[in-house]
Amino acid sequence: MMPRMGPPAAARQDNPLHVSFRNPQWPPNFINKDNVLDYFCNQANAFYEMNSCNQQIRMQNIVNRTVEECLRTMPGIQYVLWYSQPPLFIICKQRRNNVTNVSPIAYYYVINGSVHQAPDMYSLVQSRLLGALEPLRNAFGEVTNYSRYNTAKGYYWEFKNKPNVKKREEEKKEDEEEKLEDRSTNFQKTRTMMLLNQLFSEMPAEDALEREEKEEVEEEEEETLKTEEPTTSTDEPKFAEPTARTTSKQ
């Protein structure tokens, strides 16, 4: 089996956003805008490059001119103080092309003696989106559990928190005392009209009228047949009683 190709572990660089630097020999309240660059330009700081213009000035030990004046005339990578509001300091890593042209590379902030790299816009937006997607996913999953559907009501919400029994009894009493008219929603109206139209298409009114006329004719024929049938009496025939004969004496 061939070994897996890839960069060695020593060549792999950590994410600079997860790296920080702190010098325990410097107390945080001692750092100010005049010495924050000296605090940042430390060989143990992973964000500091030894081939920068700041390191050249430190090696030359220039005293007559300030660091800002020296950096204006030196092309290359430089570290300058961009913003200062103790205990927060922002340092800009830039590349000076000439006296007037400067290209920023990265920004670092020093707060309470800890040095961190400021995230770029892509990393910031990506982190915020990832942080917002998980709560949104959980919220949508929770909401779908309360969604219900009914042909009469349509879509509605049914939450687990049930109202109190007393409120239900009061609502029932109010409904019994006050007779309200039946109300219907737009969904119910449209649904009812659709069902009626479907029934009318399946059973048109003309067929219903013809059926009624046929039924009436059949009923009339049955009545006429009943009247024409001879009536048979079950009573026995009655005969006249014989009159008594009277005999006359001569």
UniProtKB/Swiss-Prot annotation:
Xref: InterPro entries: Mediator_Med6 (IPR007018), Mediator_Med6_met/pln (IPR016820), Mediator_Med6_sf (IPR038566)
Alphabetical keyword list: Activator, Developmental protein, Nucleus, Transcription, Transcription regulation
Acidic residues composition-biased segments: 204-223
Biased composition (Basic and acidic residues): 224-239
One GO process term, biological-process aspect: regulation of transcription by RNA polymerase II
Region annotation Disordered: where it falls in the sequence: 166-250
Localization annotation: Nucleus
Top-level lineage group: Eukaryota
GO MF assignments: transcription coactivator activity
Subunit relationships: Component of the Mediator complex. Interacts with let-19/mdt-13. Interacts with RNA polymerase II. Interacts with mdt-28.
Protein name per the record: Mediator of RNA polymerase II transcription subunit 6
